[in-house]
């Protein structure tokens, strides 16, 4: 699998364990870091195919910057994004929003998405700073199946949210971070039906969540050396059910919660 991180925090569906690409929007990103190849030793089994880390935006220069982008193209495709970035003394903020839609190049292939992101930061001193952010996005997607085997009413209604908080320190010979993150999702999916079949009598629903606390401190004791110690805790899980359309009855599916934690010490020396 491929692990996606936002500011170092894992991002995937807490019940099924897979990433959700439509929740990772360009309006969040200052830059994207890519680690190619297996990285399970550092990041766990989800990183067998590599790691993508999205680093969120921050206003570095004093003042206010506003930006708006609008694009329109084939198949009634619309892409919009606006952002406001502020840096005033020790305080900084980023607020962004976006709306995107398309009819798709085939019937029953519509896609619509809207979302918003906000980040606030404060520098207590040259060495200590704190920041927190929140992102919520909702998208509606339709899947027409293949041309040979079309699908009807295969529609998804998905809402994803994330929030995080971090306290950071940066000194000449040591640096570290204490951070908290919380991700959640609400999914409503109609699996659709093929030609000759009857429409679905129930729809899939799920709620999932993932949260964690991470602490590490890294220090350079002498030339070429770096020692890092830390602790990670993660909780993830959720529940799923099918809702019967005729009666509103809820048929339970999976209800699972898991916790994991680990401490570590890493010693490196350049030779």
Which sequence ranges carry the predicted segments?
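Outer-membrane beta-barrel channels and translocator barrels
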Residues: 88-91, 125-127, 137, 171-174, ...
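Short acidic/polar hinge/loop motifs at secondary-structure boundaries
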Residues: 9-36
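Hydrophobic, lipid-facing positions within transmembrane beta-strands of outer-membrane proteins
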Residues: 50, 64-68, 78-82, 114-118, ...
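Transmembrane beta-barrel strands of outer-membrane/channel proteins
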Residues: 68-72, 95-99, 132-138, 178-184, ...
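Outer-membrane beta-barrel transmembrane domain signature of Gram-negative proteins
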Residues: 200-271
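Outer-membrane beta-barrel architecture
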Residues: 63-67, 90-92, 129, 173-177, ...
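Flexible loop and strand-edge segments within Gram-negative outer membrane beta-barrel domains
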Residues: 102-109, 113, 127-210, 248-251
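Short strand-turn segments of transmembrane beta-barrel domains in outer membranes
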Residues: 39, 51, 56-86, 96-97, ...
């Amino acid at each position: 699998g491929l692990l996606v991180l936002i500011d170092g925090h894992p991002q995937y569906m807490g019940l099924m364990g897979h990433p959700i690409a439509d929740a990772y929007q360009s309006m969040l990103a200052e830059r994207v870091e890519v680690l190619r190849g297996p990285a399970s030793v550092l990041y766990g089994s989800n990183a067998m195919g590599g790691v993508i880390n999205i680093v969120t935006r921050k206003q570095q220069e004093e003042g206010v910057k506003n930006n708006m982008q609008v694009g329109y193209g084939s198949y009634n495709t619309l892409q919009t994004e606006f952002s406001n970035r502020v840096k005033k003394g020790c305080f900084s903020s980023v607020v962004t929003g976006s709306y995107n839609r398309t009819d798709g190049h085939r019937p029953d292939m519509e896609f619509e998405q809207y979302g918003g992101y906000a980040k606030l930061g404060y520098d207590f001193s040259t060495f200590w700073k704190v920041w927190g952010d929140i992102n919520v996005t909702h998208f509606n997607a339709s899947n027409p199946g293949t041309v040979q085997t079309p699908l009807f009413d295969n529609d998804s209604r998905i809402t994803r949210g994330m929030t995080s908080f971090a306290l950071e320190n940066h000194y000449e010979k040591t640096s570290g971070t204490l951070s908290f993150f919380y991700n959640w999702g609400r999914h409503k999916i109609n699996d659709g039906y093929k030609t000759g079949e009857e429409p679905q009598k129930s729809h899939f629903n799920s709620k999932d969540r993932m949260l964690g606390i991470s602490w590490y401190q890294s220090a350079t004791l002498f030339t070429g050396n770096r020692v890092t110690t830390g602790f990670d805790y993660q909780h993830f899980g959720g529940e799923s059910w099918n809702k019967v359309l005729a009666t509103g009855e809820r048929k339970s599916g999976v209800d699972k919660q898991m916790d994991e934690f680990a401490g570590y010490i890493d010693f490196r020396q350049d030779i």
